[in-house]
Amino acid sequence: MVSNKNDKKKLGKGTTAVHSGTSSSENSLNTPVYQTSTFYLDDNAYEMWMNGVPRAPVYSGRYFNPTNRAVEKKIADLEGAEDALVFSSGMAAICTSLLNFLGQGDRIVTTRNLYGGTVLSLDQDFTRFGIDVHYVDIKDLDAVEKALKEKKTNVLYCETVTNPLLEVS
């Protein structure tokens, strides 16, 4: 793949989708699929991991996999972003994103017209973490505005098109 950032901008979406994420050190024309769960961790990688270095080298498929990393690089290149992160499920993506912005004492304004697993997590887990979950009819803009003004809100969250009702929020 092209290593110069300016050259990457010249590539079409199709070329980017096919070739991003592959490592020139592997000399592979296709993105490899790694079907292993454990990777060798050398002394340098171990030290990086122990020091909390983000994106430290691979050691377990539970935390990192070269196949996933290739997909992340492809998505980032296609979106013109610095980086990307993939998850094994929608709930993992939703919870990670929300918990990145919310902590004990924070507030989220949302709607009950969400995927059932999201509502369950908000009602059981987020409240247990001390996060104030406030539900409104997301289509009632006056109710949304009132909820946002009555107390400091850290996140306004809705899904569109909703699952499973396919409503536009």
Regions found by a protein language model. Name each.
Residues 43-92, 117-126:
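Conserved N-terminal alpha-helix of the aminotransferase class I/II PLP-enzyme fold
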Residues 27, 75, 93, 108, ...:
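Buried hydrophobic positions in well-ordered alpha/beta secondary-structure cores of metabolic enzymes
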Residues 2-65, 73:
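N-terminal "arm"/small-domain region of PLP-dependent enzymes with the aminotransferase-like
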Residues 78-81, 102-107, 127, 152-156:
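Short, surface-exposed connector motifs at secondary-structure boundaries
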Residues 100-117, 136:
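Conserved PLP-anchoring active-site segment centered on the Schiff-base-forming lysine
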Residues 120-169:
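PLP-dependent aminotransferase-class I/II
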Residues 80-81, 92, 107, 141-145:
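Well-ordered alpha/beta subsegment
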